[in-house]
């Protein structure tokens, strides 16, 4: 898992739109995935951003804890 996420604004026909991006594994490759949230002026789009960010950080935290446990399990006994 490549950790990384963010927000980008794309202008379409003169209007700004919000997109949340993150990395995903697809077919053994890491790709940057964009999720449309809505108009940059929309309060609902801002709420969707907060929800997407919280969900992503939760998944990333689970993956990091799993990796930590794997690494610690490989330590030789004291």
What is each residue range found by the language model?
Residues 1-78:
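Conserved glycine(s) in the ABC-transporter nucleotide-binding domain "signature"
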